[in-house]
Amino acid sequence: MTTKRKPYVRPMTSTWWKKLPFYRFYMLREGTAVPAVWFSIELIFGLFALKHGAESWMGFVGFLQNPVVVILNLITLAAALLHTKTWFELTPKAANIIVKDEKMGPEPIIKGLWVVTAVVTVVILYVALFW
């Protein structure tokens, strides 16, 4: 026997995520993938320019000096930092580190990750600029 009753379908607007700050921040965090795609394409373009010689590389450097590209790269940097911050805050929730029979709080783990990030950044900059 089948029923003729229609199931209730709750209406969902396309702006459902704008109602709560948690959802807005979630959408912002997920949106950091778009600048990551831009940077990936730019990096691949740069590698091909490097492969094709000095003239092609100089064209790529000129492309990077375009003010629009500089602004896009600054937006990409901000998005990468936001993404990094959120992942560093999630890491302690996924790792149970026990020291002297007590669970370690999230602060030392988050600070440690930022220290590692800063050290690696300084090493890469030193190698790139002075090696």
From Swiss-Prot:
InterPro entries: Fumarate_red_C, SQR/QFR_C/D. Keywords: Cell inner membrane, Cell membrane, Membrane, Transmembrane, Transmembrane helix. It is a multi-pass membrane protein. GO terms for cellular component: fumarate reductase complex; plasma membrane. The chain crosses the membrane at residues 30-50, 57-77, 109-129. GO terms for molecular function: succinate dehydrogenase activity. It is found in: Cell inner membrane. The keyword Membrane applies. SUPFAM superfamilies: Fumarate reductase respiratory complex transmembrane subunits (SSF81343). Two distinct, membrane-bound, FAD-containing enzymes are responsible for the catalysis of fumarate and succinate interconversion; fumarate reductase is used in anaerobic growth, and succinate dehydrogenase is used in aerobic growth. Anchors the catalytic components of the fumarate reductase complex to the cell inner membrane, binds quinones. Part of an enzyme complex containing four subunits: a flavoprotein (FrdA), an iron-sulfur protein (FrdB), and two hydrophobic anchor proteins (FrdC and FrdD). HAMAP family: Fumarate_red_C. This is Fumarate reductase subunit C. It comes from Salmonella heidelberg (strain SL476). The lineage of its organism: Bacteria, Pseudomonadati, Pseudomonadota, Gammaproteobacteria, Enterobacterales. The gene is frdC.
